Amino acid sequence: MASAPVKAAAGAGAAQINDFLAYSTGAAEQRALQNPTVSRSKDLLASLIGCLEMRHYSKQWTGERYEEIYLPVEPWMEQPDPKVTRNFFYSNIFSDLFFHGRAFAFVTSRYSTGLPASFTWLPAAMVTTPNQTGPQWFGPSDVVQFNGVEIGDSNDVIQFLSPIQGLLYQGARALSIATHLDQAADRYATLETVPGYLQQKGGETLDSDSLSEIAAAWSAMRRQNAIGALNDYVEFKEFSVSPAEVVGEQRKYQSLEIARVSNIPAYLVSAPQEGSGLTYTNVQDSNRQLYLYGAKPFIECIQQTLSASNVLPRNRFVKFDIENYLEEEMHDVMVEPYVDISEESPS
């Protein structure tokens, strides 16, 4: 199927589109990605979605059901943004859906029919919609601002709306707890000795200032030397339960909470679960579970948005080739080893 001639997209759009010096994904997203479980969850899903091929088809009624008739792909289906790879484009579209619950692509050129021919990704953190402040998005916005500049024609912006609220909203409490636990672990990592306290054993009772001076001197000495010195009147005592161990257990549990709010099977992000282990069945089904529980809502959001009438003609659709992906991955992931258990014949 020959592509129609291409012409520039109507409307100048926001002045700062493609001015990458002004681009930002937002402090909240960058802070969330510092958590290893969040980073792992996002990367697992992005590696799946960003690597899928796109298929182009129409539907034909057979008298009993609709049959998919596959068509040649348009150039933008292979490379939505001519300046970057398909992997880059869709991975970032997914990332915005994952964190913000919506994503945006600006139409940079159109066919002679008026339908989009190419796109560029707009970071969701830089997009504002005056009539919707979130976290629940109720539909496409008629007024779209990019970095504070209103885009002249909102039809030049393809708006992807996730069926799931963004992680930065629905996971705000879990992320806050995880951040505080990471900060506590960072503090304990700088301790020169085991956590404990100094206790006066005898002599004249010291006031708070004197006790503070002794504690500061003890801490400073421990930072400089492996051995500290105390007199007969002061004793160092370890805490019965190490705060570092308590924080460690809390961080393990919080990694499980992050996996839950990310809709990722816990074992895929190495989050510990009581009474469970990684079995052969888990490994064999991992890609299918990642798709069903984590990636499918985002995949459906992207392919249905790009199949809408403002992108494709009537009865034309696109979808990711998830069937071949799962078939190939399930075949290559793991082959159950053959073990010869035949009994030795008695001598």
Predicted ranges, named:
Residues 1-247, 253, 257, 329-347:
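Structured, contiguous alpha/beta core segments that scaffold functional sites
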Residues 227-228, 266-277, 308-312:
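Short acidic alpha-helical/loop segments enriched in Asp/Glu that coordinate divalent cations
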Residues 237, 278-280:
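Beta-rich nucleic-acid/ligand-interaction surfaces
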Residues 259-262:
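Short amphipathic alpha-helical "interface-anchor" segments enriched in bulky aromatics
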Residues 96, 277-278:
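Short Asp/Glu-rich motifs
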Residues 242-245, 283-287:
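Short glycine/threonine-rich loop-to-helix capping motif typified by GTGT followed
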Residues 284-319:
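Long, compositionally biased
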